[in-house]
Swiss-Prot record:
Subunit comment: In spleen, forms a homomer. The functional molecule forms a roughly spherical shell with a diameter of 12 nm and contains a central cavity into which the insoluble mineral iron core is deposited.
Catalytic activity of the protein: 4 Fe(2+) + O2 + 4 H(+) = 4 Fe(3+) + 2 H2O
Any GO molecular function: ferrous iron binding
Matching Pfam families: Ferritin (PF00210)
Species assigned in the record: Trematomus bernacchii
Entry-linked CDD domains: Euk_Ferritin
InterPro entries named in the record: Ferritin, Ferritin-like, Ferritin-like_diiron, Ferritin-like_SF, Ferritin_CS, Ferritin_DPS_dom
Protein EC: 1.16.3.1
Protein name: Ferritin, spleen middle subunit
EC top class, as a word: oxidoreductase
pH dependence comment: Stable at acidic pHs.
Domain of life: Eukaryota
């Protein structure tokens, strides 16, 4: 049944929003995996765990905003299976930050692609929504992760577990 509130909302935009919802939920799922990996008794880096748990919550909020947007525009929500993260063991701080950086870049590219679809279908509401709630935040997340990788690498944290511990404690706010 078609929505009575639907106006200037192309089916391609609707489908792309559904795909974006899935991507945000995948990102949330991946960050949850990272968070609880760092909470393990044999890893025990609470700052990393907290950081990734917050990222998971944020990605879930992004999905919720898209779900609300879809309903407000008269679109229909079609949830898809959420893919399992590519790994269960996340390794060291540098490795996981590089994975997180790639994840954020993938999400950013998907948002840019969604914006391009919305622009092509002349949907100023969707363009404004994406610009207001997503695009700048993605760039900030990418920059933050890049900075973390630079500082962890500078400390040679891959070979120096004390450096990783200190980064967790002082930069990530970990408390043991």
């Amino acid at each position: 049944m078609d929505s009575q509130v639907r106006q200037n909302y192309h089916r391609d935009c609707e489908a792309a929003v559904n795909r974006m919802i899935n991507m945000e939920l995948f990102a949330s799922y991946s960050y949850t995996s990272m968070a609880f990996y760092f909470s393990r008794d044999d890893v025990a880096l609470p700052g990393f765990a907290h950081f990734f748990k917050e990222n998971s919550d944020e990605e879930r909020e992004h999905a919720d905003k898209l779900l609300t947007f879809q309903n407000s525009r008269g679109g229909r929500i079609f949830l898809q299976d959420i893919k399992k993260p590519e790994r269960d063991e996340w390794g060291n701080g540098v490795d996981v930050m590089q994975c997180a950086l790639q994840l954020e870049k993938n999400v950013n590219q998907a948002l840019l692609d969604l914006h391009k679809i919305a622009s092509g279908k002349v949907d100023p509401h969707m363009c404004d929504f994406l610009e207001t709630h997503y695009l700048n935040e993605q760039v900030e997340s990418i920059k933050k992760l890049g900075d973390f990788i630079t500082n962890l690498s500078r400390m040679d944290a891959v070979k120096n577990k004390m450096a990783e511990y200190l980064f967790d404690k002082h930069t990530m706010g970990g408390k043991n």
